[in-house]
Regions:
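Conserved class I S-adenosyl-L-methionine
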Residues: 214-219
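Class I SAM-dependent methyltransferase Rossmann-like catalytic core
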Residues: 188-196
Length: 219
């Protein structure tokens, strides 16, 4: 319908109050993961002459990434979920590994075919590696305020509030969040200004040898 994903999610959450905060976060994560992997999720159905729709994408996503904890056959007819899976759809999904093995490279790596030449020219030998990274959620990095604290103390403080981080070998002031990012804004470390969200690339810019205390940087 042309509505942005953010707007569609906002409207859905507004009209479906039964979805709590954890549910809303999980739904958002799944929706954006599906969008990143959209081409490969639809491909098995595309070559079987299906039209793309949200239901097909979700069924494919659940089958590929959630079948260890969830069975599509458990879906029953109700107003809160997808209609039960059809036999033909299940047959397609059961053969999904065979379809994926034969999929074109742009489908596997999730990019438009017409961009392949330019992407390979730009990325060179890193092409496959970079495109695979784009299929996953971007990592979340924190910058430590070294004037107020240090990496070790803040890593420990964050863990006490269920925010698990790891050190980043590329930066002396960065932590990478592994889990618990939903607790960050209410954490004491964030509220006190000991940490803030900042991309790793921006942090590395300030750590080059030519930069010294007191200098101003245009990021």
């Amino acid at each position: 319908s042309g509505i942005s994903i953010e707007k569609a999610l906002k409207e859905w959450f507004k009209n479906n109050r039964f979805a709590g905060s954890n549910d809303r976060r999980s739904i958002r994560d799944i929706i954006f993961d599906i969008l990143r992997k959209r081409l490969i999720l639809f491909y098995p159905f595309q070559i079987n002459d299906y039209y793309e729709n949200g239901r097909i994408l979700v069924l494919s996503y659940l089958y590929i990434y959630k079948r260890d904890t969830f069975s599509l056959c458990d879906i029953v007819d109700n107003k809160y979920f997808l209609p039960p899976i059809k036999n033909k759809e299940l047959l397609i999904l059961n053969k999904i590994n065979d379809y994926i093995k034969k999929a074109p490279k742009n489908i596997l790596l999730g990019y438009p075919e017409f961009l392949e030449k330019k992407l390979k020219t730009t990325l060179g030998n890193d092409f496959d590696k970079v495109m695979k990274i784009f299929l996953e959620r971007a990592p979340i990095y924190l910058r430590i305020n070294n004037l107020k604290t240090n990496l070790k103390d803040e890593k420990s403080n964050l863990e006490k509030e269920n925010i698990i981080c790891e050190y980043c070998s590329a930066s002396k002031s960065a932590l990478r969040i592994k889990s618990g990012e939903q607790f960050l804004k209410k954490s004491s470390s964030y509220q006190l200004g000991n940490v803030e969200l900042q991309d790793l690339s921006s942090q590395l810019t300030t750590e080059v040898d030519e930069i010294s205390p007191g200098k101003r940087i245009l990021d």
